[in-house]
Amino acid sequence: MNNKQQTFQFENAFADVFMFENGTEVREYHVMIHANSSRLPYAQQLEAVLGAYNQLIEGELVGAQAVFKRYFLSDAANQADDVIVSDVTDCAKSIIQQAPLDGTKIALWVYLMTNVQTGLSKSGLYEVRHGDFRHLWNGSAHNMAANSEYQTRLLFNEYNMQLIQEECTLEANCIRTWFFVNDVDLNYGGVVRARNQFFFTQGLTVNTHFIASTGIGGRQQDPNVLSQMDNYAIAGIRKEQVHYLYASTHLNRTSDYGVSFERGTQVNYADRRHVFISGTASINNKGEVVYPKDIIKQTHRMWENVEALLAEADCNFNDVAEMVVYLRDTADYELVREMYEERFAGKPYVIVHAPVCRPGWLIEMECMAIKAVDLPTMPKF
């Protein structure tokens, strides 16, 4: 087995860790750190989470460098500034109000690698260098344009200019995006319109390809921010390394119902495969909500859909390194937590409050998988 899962206990926090190791110099870790006492004030919960992170990178994960972090907060207006001041790690950081539903105020997902060089690139994207590749991460991009459509259009324009500075394009190099939409029921339509229009100008169509993505409810500390974008691109990636996942027995193309993202993307290297599964809900291959108003059946159908996408990349849930689970209704948390704990105990995951883009979907999940492969015609990671 190249994958290993462990849980570490700390003072007032715990961490679930997934490690990928295949004998090469780059090990990969996904870590989900949770505060374990909802009674503590926010400052102490933040201190506990950051303390757990620091102990990990000085101990079990020594030598690993953070390449991307996402903070899930219960009240960004009162909490985000403290994160910015307290965490000075040199990596892309995403900070979003999506309350952890275990009753705590903060959770942290961290993606780390060993033997890579990191730093801020000339474009403002965070660069992770190894071999022939530069992995370009960005978190918490936002602006103050008049509405969600204008904000998203400006986000794409700015990101496109950053990619051009890196001698990249959206079509050839961008692998994954996330959009966090303040009041998703009201503002998601504007995000969709802006993305559809911008993709068309960049040659991203139903006849070429789109980009794996999550579009979900979430808010920044400033209520005027209606659309926040996180993104990941790879400078140096070759077209033959990238494959898109469809699972057409279970899901339809998103363009069938007017949106433009891929269900999943796999990226092949000589020694490993990365699989990025987009936000996935209880949908069928006609684009319909399956099992309306039934959280248990929707959860099972969502898992089945994700399994079908993973299988297309010759992966399964054992290869999944992290999961983020989004719930529309906080009242569903205990039931969903029990289901996840029964099936995925020890796997790095977090369940947060974040309405899905269509009201009928009660739950959505996204994940990343890592699998050892032997593909000598592909470039080394």
Name each model feature, range by range.
Residues 1-321, 327-381:
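N-terminal presequence-like segments and the immediate start of the first folded domain
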